[in-house]
């Protein structure tokens, strides 16, 4: 969320490091509508992937990339997604929740909408990490 919603024609994303890998960049107004415009800046050649609504594509930003809305727009929210391997949780994807019971092993609790437990993405992604709960904290192996 953005506190200052003064209408501006141009917005610029400047990474704090060179070679920033970004998958998505979305600007929204106060009603949640996606604001679109023309890409500007030295990294514009690679920028189209930022707006393709695909979390698996990404671009490298070395200097900065900006957007020209054509007319001043009041931006209320900016959503960005770093490069990822799709092992996260995405709306519309199916997940399967597991728990471990000794000596049987891992048991499926069923396919369901994601919550905040270990979930296996059944649509994309193959990496998984096993953890144990020790002294009130998750220990990843």
Regions found by a protein language model. Give the residues of each.
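Aromatic, loop-rich ligand-recognition surfaces of beta-strand-rich domains
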Residues: 1-117, 121-141
């Amino acid at each position: 969320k953005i506190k200052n919603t003064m209408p501006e024609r141009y917005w610029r994303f400047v990474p704090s490091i060179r070679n920033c890998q970004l998958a998505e960049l979305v600007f929204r107004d106060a009603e949640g509508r996606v604001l679109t415009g023309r890409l500007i800046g030295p990294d514009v050649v690679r920028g189209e992937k930022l707006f393709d609504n695909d979390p698996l594509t990404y671009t490298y930003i070395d200097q900065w990339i900006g957007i020209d809305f054509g007319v001043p727009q009041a931006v209320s929210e900016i959503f960005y997604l770093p490069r990822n391997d799709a092992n996260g949780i995405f709306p519309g994807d199916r997940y399967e929740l597991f728990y471990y019971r000794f000596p049987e092993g891992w048991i499926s609790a069923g396919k369901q909408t994601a919550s905040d437990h270990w979930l296996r993405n059944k649509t994309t992604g193959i990496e998984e990490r096993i953890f144990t709960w020790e002294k009130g904290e998750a220990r990843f192996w």
